[in-house]
Amino acid sequence: MAFRPSRLAIFIDGNNMFYAQQKNGWFFDPRRVLNYFANRPEIELVNAYWYTGLKDPQDQRGFRDALVSLGYTVRTKMLKEFHDESNGNRYFQRANLDIEIVIDMFNTVEQYDEIVLFSGDGDFERAIELLRAKQTHITVVSTDGMIARELRNATDRYIDLNDIRSFIEKTERPEPFVSAPVIAPA
């Protein structure tokens, strides 16, 4: 029987990860993320998606163009402003891209055997349960204090960003790819 690599799709909830990275005090490099998860002979990367909210159509243009040049499919939505009177009349902005992430997961489910989801949002719990029922292996990447318990419990494997920091952290100078260690399931 011929060897067939496991087909991988990566889904990055950019807004959720922005806050996780701020909490950690460091940022990951999108190129190094691809290398870490897909640069192994037993893995075939079939797609990588990045989802982010925008203040205006030109917001993050350079970053989005760089993501596309790395091979990411970039999905965007305009930020909406909300007023929270219960919190001292504070205004906040939000672009909820959860439904876009789930739609892409299910529209492409026949293309992959496993996914890596960068998010801590508990809204993904049911989608993850349904994908696991289809024999899809799910890894969720987030950080302690930013991941919903129900999401962490629904996944096959959880990786804390800080555990893979040395492999994915954004640095001032490009570094050669270093083979990633195998991280045992939590």
From Swiss-Prot:
GO MF term list: RNA nuclease activity
Alphabetized UniProt keyword annotations: Biological rhythms
Loss of function: phenotype: Cells grow slowly on solid but not liquid medium, excess KaiC expression no longer autorepresses, decreases the amplitude of circadian rhythms. Partially restores sasA deletion phenotypes suggesting they are not in the same output pathway, does not restore rpaA deletion, suggesting rpaA is downstream of labA in the same output pathway. In double labA-cikA deletions KaiC levels are much higher than either deletion alone, but the phosphorylation ratios are nearly wild-type.
Positions of disulphide bridges: none
Induction line: Transcripts rise slowly in low continuous light with little rhythmicity.
Keyword Nucleotide-binding in annotation: no
CDD domains with a match to the protein in the record: PIN_LabA
Record flagged with keyword rRNA-binding: no
PANTHER family: SLR0755 PROTEIN
Name recorded for this polypeptide: Low amplitude and bright protein LabA
Record organism: Synechococcus elongatus (strain ATCC 33912 / PCC 7942 / FACHB-805)
